[in-house]
Regions:
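Fungal secretory targeting signals
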Residues: 1-18
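Glycan-recognition and catalytic cores of secretory/periplasmic carbohydrate-active enzymes
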Residues: 20-367
Length: 367
């Protein structure tokens, strides 16, 4: 569950960029200097960015040092954009040139990943480029960053299969041809495709992204708002072959992080593609996520909502969901729903932040 600890920390300043909620912004402002101290220690532990083959932090364990990964690594490289994304968000929060310079230094080496479609999950391109170059362009307006985002969009568009109506995800066995895997995580990784369609890329990309989202709704979102992690199709006929999980407890269970990806991803899809069905799905997924926490009398999810007994909690899923709920509050349509989603986000984030802080103290975190 620590593999995404960096996301949980990054999502705290991310809330500042995503929401107009003054209560959350006040909380973030109070804690900002503490966050800066943690990330400064991370930078110090990593040293300067090497000219070639830089390694990016993705996990911190009991040893008190960061575990790092190459961006091209199949198992962990998909996380490599999160750290520069975190640096860009700190620049946004402080306008410190030191954070900007660090963000630029850690972002630039990732440019080649925009075309890395030979990954075990080629949609990871969206994770890597969206969080790093996406924030870089948003905060600087530098067209060099925009060009990389659109290169990622082009790569994702090349993975689209019109017969299935989706962008291909996993490429490892048993998901090799004739199988065609679509995963719930993909709702978070199609940002370059969605955004690029109206920002210098091909206009057809919007249709690809919208059809993909509808395919996910039909085949990965259950009627009660819970989600499968993966749906497998026949790449030639488009027929659905199976629904299940890889990272979750069982094929019929709900992997908490996947549920969080869906929540955030469908809000993002609604914001960029303006399809009411995506908002409805985001609300259904959010209601299921929060409902499970309320039923369990807690505001931090287990790694899988259906795993039996006492299970490890997943603060990364909590942080992703909290961010998604704040985004959802901005498009909810009524003041009552806005308040409800913000309250849910605040409850989740407050409990998760406390859990993360305790973990940092107990394990002498490398932060």
């Amino acid at each position: 569950m620590q593999r995404l600890a960096l996301i949980a920390l990054a999502s705290i300043p991310c809330l500042m960029s995503e929401a107009d909620a003054s209560t959350l912004q006040d909380t973030i402002a109070t804690d900002l200097s503490f966050i800066e101290q943690l990330v400064t220690k991370t930078l110090d532990s990593l040293g300067s960015v090497p000219a070639a083959n830089p390694l990016y932090p993705y996990a911190g364990g009991d040893s008190g040092t960061w575990t790092t990964t190459s961006p091209s690594d199949g198992a962990h490289g998909w996380t490599s954009g999160f750290f520069p994304g975190e640096l860009w968000l700190l620049y946004q929060a402080t306008r410190s040139t030191a954070w900007r310079d660090a963000a630029q230094a850690w972002t630039t080496p990732l440019a080649s990943q925009a075309s890395s479609v030979d990954r075990i999950d080629p949609t990871d391109i969206g994770f890597i480029i969206g969080t790093s170059f996406g924030n870089a362009y948003r905060l600087t307006g530098d067209t060099a960053y925009k060009n990389v985002i659109n290169a990622a969009g082009k790569s994702l568009a090349g993975l689209y299969n019109p017969t299935v109506g989706a962008v291909r995800s996993w490429t490892f066995s048993p998901y090799v041809p004739p199988n065609f895997a679509v995963i719930i995580d993909s709702m978070m990784t199609l940002g370059p495709l969605q955004w690029g369609a109206s920002n210098g890329g091909m206009s057809t990309w919007a249709g690809y992204a919208a059809t993909h989202a509808q395919t996910v709704i039909t085949n990965l979102v259950r009627p009660n708002g819970s989600t499968f992690e993966v749906a497998v199709f026949d790449r030639t006929t488009g027929a659905l072959k199976s629904q299940g999980t890889f990272a979750g407890y069982s094929d019929s269970s709900t992997w908490a992080r996947g549920q969080a990806w869906a929540l955030y991803g469908f809000v993002q899809a609604y914001q960029t593609l303006d399809n009411p069905a995506f908002l409805t799905t985001a609300e259904d997924v959010a209601n299921y996520f929060v409902g499970q926490l309320v039923a369990d009398h807690t505001w931090i999810p287990p790694w899988d909502f259906d795993a039996p007994g006492t299970q490890p909690v997943d603060t990364s899923a909590a942080a992703i969901a909290a961010d998604g709920l704040v985004m959802l509050s901005t498009v909810a349509g009524t003041s009552a729903l806005e308040t409800m989603y913000l309250d849910d986000a605040e409850n989740i984030l407050g409990r998760s932040a406390a859990t993360i802080l305790i973990t940092l103290i107990r394990k002498a975190s490398p932060c």
